Design a protein with these regions (language model features):
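Short, solvent-exposed loop/turn segments at secondary-structure junctions
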Residues: 11-13, 43-48, 88-91, 189-193
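Conserved, well-ordered alpha-helix/loop/beta-strand core segments that scaffold catalytic motifs
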Residues: 174-183, 189-194
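Acidic/histidine-rich helix-loop elements
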Residues: 7-21
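Extreme N-terminal starter segment of soluble prokaryotic enzymes
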Residues: 1-5
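Active-site charged/polar residues at nucleotide-handling catalytic sites that mediate phosphoryl
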Residues: 32-33, 178
Length: 211
């Protein structure tokens, strides 16, 4: 049977240190899972650029720091196949600003509310055995994105709904072409709840959280 795990990460190094989700923790979780394949939140074009030049980090849309510092080297050292699954179109991304179309004053108010949602998410860090991989975090995240949908349904659809649909479909395609393998999805923790809700319906053994 195909085994699929989900590991939600925090991209910001300072926040990782503050909330006890270090790269060392991520490394131990990946090593415990023993993946044959890692499906990571990296754009396919960014992955191609990395393959051509492993020092090319200056373009917009580059992978988050945990990929450069941990995941890519770990894959290379342990012969783990890496599959990039992220999706976005940089030329139109800013056209779907969730606070676009609002006055400057209202944008500032919305940004403040968005910041409050972030702090609510961070407040769940001690729930579960892995920071930000818990029912409590996922529920707070779901509520945050329901609010963003109310603010701007069009932007939410492109930046969140469609993006996650494509990311998850790339995982499904990887599952279909690699039966009976151990596949680890590594994504920003905000994506956890959508990945879990969708992949639980597949004929696989889904592991989330990993501990």
């Amino acid at each position: 049977m195909t085994v699929v795990g989900i590991l939600g990460t925090i991209h910001n190094p300072e926040l990782r240190e503050k909330y006890n989700c270090s790269l060392a923790l991520y490394e131990s979780l990946i090593t415990e899972f023993k993946p044959d394949i890692i499906c990571g939140e990296v754009h396919p074009l960014s992955w191609q650029k990395y393959i051509k030049d492993r020092n090319n980090k200056g373009y917009w849309g580059e992978p988050a720091s945990e990929y450069w510092e941990l995941i890519f080297p770990l894959c290379e050292a342990n012969q783990i196949e890496f599959v990039p699954i992220d999706w976005f179109e940089l030329d139109v991304w800013n056209n779907f600003d969730p606070f676009g179309g609002y006055s400057e004053e209202r944008r500032e108010e919305l940004q403040q509310i968005d910041d409050e949602w972030f702090f609510k998410q961070m407040s769940t860090h001690a729930s579960g055995d892995i920071p930000f991989n818990s029912v409590e975090f996922d529920e707070m995240t779901r509520l945050k994105y329901e609010w963003l949908n109310e603010i701007n349904p069009t932007a939410h659809n492109i930046r969140w709904v469609v993006r996650n649909q494509i990311m998850i479909q790339r995982v499904k395609n990887t599952m279909d072409s690699n039966p009976n393998k151990r596949i680890l999805c590594i994504v920003g923790a905000d994506h956890n709840y959508l990945f879990q809700e969708t992949l639980i319906k597949e004929p696989i053994l889904l592991l989330y959280p990993l501990r």
